[in-house]
């Protein structure tokens, strides 16, 4: 009762052949087995929030495993292998009834998929999705702000938006800028293919501008500005952080302190940069 445990059930993906022996369809049987496995590994009786990691059906965002596809492949529009949303919801209802999960949510969903799940749950008398976890940070704002903010307002669905990658996989710490310490460690150096959406795009150039803003407003570092900005969005209920050590964890927690404010002037400058770099991770250099 002292912590909230959240985990996910992954869906089909060509680059996750090792997961559940390659059978990652979000069928009822697979979802139930995945939750039992999570309960065993977590050594707990229940999960507070179970999330469906990404859609089982075809959507452009996850077709190639890197969440940055921008073209809609019409040949994949009819996906005969996708599990109906009704079947996925049936599995979630079973888990709720069994007491193995307290709430359920979505992740990397589309506005249509989120609303469809919400309506199906209402029709079936099942608890509606509590949350939808989405990619959101200074470099990636458009899909959330244009497609989900209105959908998730309290008077509409009331689904909580959880932001993941608030530091853009570490890019928004500033440690990968060329004038920073070249010996710095990080996943993007140790695993060059990790989060390739931030490599080979205009993201690095945008980061330089955000770094300069952070310094001009006397922020301790770019990380503090990036995290604090996400946390102060009125439509973001919480954010998912990641830390490799206690120093990074302390830095992340410190950013939740209200002493690191976002003034109206700073907000305007950030929005001006967003106008300049509206979707940098989708534009190749």
Swiss-Prot record:
The UniProt record lists the keyword NADP: yes
Disulphide bond pairs: none
Keywords recorded for this protein, A-Z: NADP, Oxidoreductase
Short name of one Pfam family: Aldo_ket_red
Chain positions recorded as NADP(+) binding sites: 165-175
Protein family according to the UniProt entry: Belongs to the aldo/keto reductase family. Aldo/keto reductase 2 subfamily.
Name of the protein this chain belongs to: Aldo-keto reductase
Organism: Babesia bovis
Lineage: Eukaryota, Sar, Alveolata, Apicomplexa, Aconoidasida
